[in-house]
Amino acid sequence: MALDVKKYPFIKSLDDELKKYGGGITLTDLLLNSTTLIDQAKDRIQKTKSGDELPHYVSYNEPVLVFYTTLLSLAILNDVKLIRRYAYAEAKQFRSLLHTENEENLLEISKLLDLKINRCDPIKFYLEKKRRIIQKEFCVHFIDYLKYTKDLKEDWKLSGQILHKGYVYLDKNQLIGLIAESIKSKIVEMIRPLNLKEIPEKLKSLIERRGIIPPCIENILAKEKLNEEEIRTLITFYIDIGKGLSGIVSIMKKYNVSNVEDLYRKYRGDKGTRYIVYSCAKMKQLGLCVSSCNVKNPLQLYFLSNE
């Protein structure tokens, strides 16, 4: 079965993806024409910062372009720690998909990542602690194994592996682990070569743009205790700007709100029931408006502040 590029967009080059738009079209051209891809990329980056799981790429209309737009965005932001966190989060997301793949697809992905892993004659051994027979049918030369696992934990030490005639034998879970580690390294490497001098200032501005927190939200954040409407306003605001559950829990911690997770699920809802932050008119009725911002909704100030 052929690999699904919608699940693993890194297996397709950006140049190949852009061919469907005709000659001469660049990613920059597409991004300057519409901010949808930038918004989706920034959402992935925000989820990384918040510690939330990244959505699978199959949820996007243009998964390959979202992938490369995110890499471009990270290169422009130029935050080494964030890049590493993102690569880790992506590897984790891809790893969950790898567990659903058959062995042929796993070996194909390994090949695309330049991992020298092969299917070998199965080797069986008795694991005394677990009192069962273990079978491993993938193998990699020990020199390559050391290279692939140099940044991994103790469990991956060569001394703890099955070594036979110069080859380390792996089971399916170990194979997936090496693929995920290779994906993480590949993502970091793919960000480095980007030539930032060739990126228009307008595009840099779109990616680097950070919204201003509205005065009404700042005023609520400054309080020591919150009433029900203030709690609702904060949670819906942060949901609407893309902050994940863990980030919202962290913000609400100081107010001793015990049911943040339940409120998050309630206000996030689905497409038919999702809540949005109150309009400025409603905020005035509730006594939560503290400034004349000349907008109809606090979200306008956040999203349009630096355009």
UniProtKB/Swiss-Prot annotation:
Select a single GO molecular function from the record's annotations and give it: metal ion binding
Q: Which residues bind [4Fe-4S] cluster?
A: 216, 280, 289, 293
Keyword set includes 4Fe-4S: yes
The record's cofactor note says: Binds 1 [4Fe-4S] cluster.
On whether 4Fe-4S is a keyword of this UniProt record, the answer is yes
Extract the Pfam families matched here. Answer: DNA_primase_lrg
The record, for CDD domains, names: PriL
Q: Which InterPro entries match?
A: DNA_primase_lsu_euk/arc, DNA_primase_lsu_PriL
What does the entry list under GO cellular component?
A: primosome complex
Q: Which UniProt keywords apply?
A: 4Fe-4S, DNA replication, Iron, Iron-sulfur, Metal-binding, Primosome
Top-rank taxon: Archaea
Cofactor names: [4Fe-4S] cluster
A GO BP annotation? DNA replication, synthesis of primer
Q: How does it assemble?
A: Heterodimer of a small subunit (PriS) and a large subunit (PriL).
Q: Which family does it belong to?
A: Belongs to the eukaryotic-type primase large subunit family.
Q: What does this protein do?
A: Regulatory subunit of DNA primase, an RNA polymerase that catalyzes the synthesis of short RNA molecules used as primers for DNA polymerase during DNA replication. Stabilizes and modulates the activity of the small subunit, increasing the rate of DNA synthesis, and conferring RNA synthesis capability. The DNA polymerase activity may enable DNA primase to also catalyze primer extension after primer synthesis. May also play a role in DNA repair. Possesses a template-independent 3'-terminal nucleotidyl transferase activity.
What name does this protein carry? DNA primase large subunit PriL
Q: Which organism is it from?
A: Saccharolobus solfataricus (strain ATCC 35092 / DSM 1617 / JCM 11322 / P2)
